[in-house]
């Protein structure tokens, strides 16, 4: 969800920016540390950033009159975690606002909090939880992470709208109304995004399994299995 300039009251713009700031600061530190330890992660990080950029540009009109789009953050959150993804997401949002007119600058903190912070955080928790069971392959785990990232992003967006514009004084009523509007198109979009993200993750695991192993995304046994299939 890209909030345009002037959509949210300035007080709420500041509030959401302050909430997003710690995640972004930590993410910048995390990226610096990661690159200093192994610069080979840079190409994959760039791919994840490009994936977010392209996917999140797809605007799909809703029958309710709003617009919905994928977020693309589930893949990056699965590979690099929520902190790194928050920075990638912020960079993408700045470029989209500056070059393409998607979203505004005064509302950047609010958009970043929903799309670049909370969505990736939820995706990472789901991905890690599924992978720790030892029963869920990479592709399906990323699928679930991407679906959750998308849905949580729009739930937070609905909350942001509800807090700024309660219906007859009721935040809950406004939240449910906004969530219902988004859900019509957003749920199918999240499933499609999940499928694409899962396929991309599986492909990357086949061509660059050693990078994903270094990131702790796949195990040594999974790498051996991939290499044996290619032999």
UniProtKB/Swiss-Prot annotation:
The pathway it acts in is: Cofactor biosynthesis; adenosylcobalamin biosynthesis
Keyword annotations for this protein, in alphabetical order, are: Cell membrane, Cobalamin biosynthesis, Cobalt, Cobalt transport, Ion transport, Membrane, Transmembrane, Transmembrane helix, Transport
Q: Which domain of life is it from?
A: Archaea
Please name the InterPro entries in this protein's record: CbiM, CbiM/NikMN
**Gene Ontology terms: biological process:** cobalamin biosynthetic process
GO MF annotation: an example: cobalt ion transmembrane transporter activity
Pfam families named among the record's database cross-references: CbiM (PF01891)
Transmembrane annotation, as ranges: 6-26, 41-61, 79-99, 107-127, 136-156, 172-192
An example Gene Ontology CC term for this record: ATP-binding cassette (ABC) transporter complex
The protein's location, in the record's own words, is: Cell membrane
Q: How does it sit in the membrane?
A: Multi-pass membrane protein
Give the principal location in a single coarse category: membrane
Protein purpose: Part of the energy-coupling factor (ECF) transporter complex CbiMNOQ involved in cobalt import.
> What family classification does the UniProt entry report for this protein?
Belongs to the CbiM family.
Q: Note the subunit structure.
A: Forms an energy-coupling factor (ECF) transporter complex composed of an ATP-binding protein (A component, CbiO), a transmembrane protein (T component, CbiQ) and 2 possible substrate-capture proteins (S components, CbiM and CbiN) of unknown stoichimetry.
Please give the NCBIfam families that the UniProt record associates with this protein: cbiM, PRK08319.1
Name the chain's protein. Answer: Putative cobalt transport protein CbiM 1
| Species name | Methanocorpusculum labreanum (strain ATCC 43576 / DSM 4855 / Z)
Origin organism lineage:
Archaea, Methanobacteriati, Methanobacteriota, Stenosarchaea group, Methanomicrobia
